[in-house]
């Protein structure tokens, strides 16, 4: 009985396993299940500057393999983009999916108050999504999910300069 129970438990873990793939080339986020099937896809915005993140404030989205460390409610969060408009309510949408990025803090996947920015390089380094897409994604994931961010062609060029 124990082995059968243990086997069912392990199989359940595998069947619930997913990975998030973010392509800076395509400006897309995909949620892939353990069989390699795409179960969710949405457009995103990434960092304003091309290339892999090097330091805090460089406006680049980090590339590599990371983990979701936490999913936080961000409904009441504000952010000052330094554009003279002051703190903006709802800048992050309803949620902030915090990523564990070695050497960097404050990187995550979140919503936006600027839906027109989706599909472009517009963020300070985070991955932005439409707020509706973010809500759907949050309903499908949990920590410590693996997140892979792949570079685009422009990023590869910048990374080798």
Question: Model-derived features: where do they sit?
Answer:
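Exported/periplasmic cell-wall-interacting domains
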Residues: 74-161
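Gly/Pro-biased beta-strand-loop elements
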Residues: 2-107, 157
């Amino acid at each position: 009985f124990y082995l059968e129970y243990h086997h069912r438990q392990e199989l359940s873990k595998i069947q619930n396993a997913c990975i998030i793939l973010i392509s800076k080339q395509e400006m897309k986020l995909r949620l892939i299940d353990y069989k390699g099937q795409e179960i969710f896809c949405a457009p995103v915005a990434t960092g304003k500057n091309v290339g892999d993140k090097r330091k805090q404030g460089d406006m680049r989205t980090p590339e590599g393999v990371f983990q979701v460390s936490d999913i936080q409610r961000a409904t009441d969060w504000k952010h000052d983009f330094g554009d003279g408009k002051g703190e903006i309510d709802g800048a992050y949408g309803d949620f902030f999916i915090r990523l564990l990025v070695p050497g960097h803090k404050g990187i995550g996947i979140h919503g936006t108050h600027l839906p027109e920015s989706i599909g472009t390089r517009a963020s300070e380094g985070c991955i932005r999504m439409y707020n509706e897409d973010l809500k759907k994604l949050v309903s499908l994931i949990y920590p410590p999910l693996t997140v892979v961010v792949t570079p685009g062609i422009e990023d590869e060029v910048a990374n080798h300069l």
